[in-house]
Regions:
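Glycine-rich anion/phosphate-binding loops
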Residues: 1, 26-41, 75
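Short, contiguous, pocket-lining structural segments
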Residues: 30-33, 46, 68, 72
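Conserved anion-binding
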Residues: 38, 51-52, 56-64, 72, ...
Length: 229
């Protein structure tokens, strides 16, 4: 209520889950606790008039393949929405911020954008209620260009629901801008152009209209092992 009074209208809560098959991670208990925390936070937000962004992040650290990512993501999202229902959260007044379905960063077999898009959409349709107004993907350490390409391919996949699929990137939106700026006043104009270019790219990708390579980007991986805020 204090934050609402100060002008806030949206809040975000992130839980991070690492995939490590050999050590049974994430465990059923870890998923249950994370889902309950997210659902309770969402209910508290709505009671205060805030729109909750629910962020159950499946981190890309690891050697797991994309099918393992699918399995974990389906379990996590199914559990999250079970807890959201139990806590009386209004679906239409909330947003989901998940990771795209990708293999671990050190996986032996990589996946192309089409496979990533198809499995991501299938996972969402299996696990996320159609009443959800929007899904705002996190980038999770993939490069700026890949984040745009994957989102673009996702929005080309035929879907059964009208849930908006868009972006809520940090590193994949800001990296080239920050590298260009370097904290120096003389670089502000160039840095702003970099930021606008990535915003334009992701805006087009949200409509399935992005042409890969049409906007300047930092194509380096933004992955940071054990990344924390």
């Amino acid at each position: 209520e204090k934050y609402y009074a100060q002008g806030a209208r949206v809040a975000k809560w992130r839980t991070a889950l690492k995939v490590d098959v050999a050590n049974n991670c994430p465990s059923d208990l870890a998923i249950e606790v994370a889902a309950q925390d997210l659902a309770r936070y969402a209910r508290i937000c709505q009671e205060a008039g805030l729109v909750p962004i629910v962020e159950p992040e499946i981190m890309i650290d690891g050697v797991h393949d994309i099918q393992t990512s699918v399995k974990v993501q389906e379990q996590v999202l199914t559990t999250v929405y079970k807890k959201i229902q139990e806590n009386g959260v209004m679906l239409e007044g909330s947003l989901l911020k998940p990771a795209m379905v990708v293999p671990g960063v050190d996986a032996a077999d990589k996946s192309d954008p089409t496979e990533i898009a198809q499995l991501t959409v299938r996972t969402l349709e299996r696990c996320v209620p159609g009443a959800m107004p929007g899904v705002t993907f996190l980038s999770g350490g993939i490069s700026e260009e890949d984040a745009s390409i994957y989102l673009n391919e996702i929005n080309k996949v035929p879907r059964k629901t009208q849930t908006r699929l868009t972006f809520s990137y940090s590193r994949a939106l800001q990296s080239s801008c920050i590298k260009t700026w370097k904290g120096e006043a003389g670089n502000v104009d160039a840095a702003q152009k970099q930021l606008l270019a990535r915003a334009q790219a992701n805006g087009e990708a949200s409509k399935g209209e992005y042409v890969p390579g049409s906007q300047p980007s930092d194509e380096e991986s933004l992955f940071v092992k054990n990344y924390v805020y």
